[in-house]
Amino acid sequence: MATTPPAALRSKTELKLWLTALIADYVDADPTSLDPHRPLAEAGLDSVYAVSVCADIEETLGIPVEPTLAWDHPTIDAIAEYLHHALALR
């Protein structure tokens, strides 16, 4: 697991772009079709994929996240905000 996230992922904008691409891969969608304000469940992210997204976040950013992240923060914007705050506390 990485101890320091890539510098490019430290801004909220870059986190949002990275998350959008990551989630688009899981739901088999074009990243431009995902609305960052729309609940991820509506975009097709199920519980199995949500846990996989959490594992990818942990591996890439080097911070632990709860497997309920996508339900506690149900949009790309909300997750990016949460992660940005968590990274700032490191």
Regions found by a protein language model. Give the residues of each.
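Flexible, low-complexity inter-domain linkers and amphipathic docking helices that mediate domain-domain
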Residues: 1-90
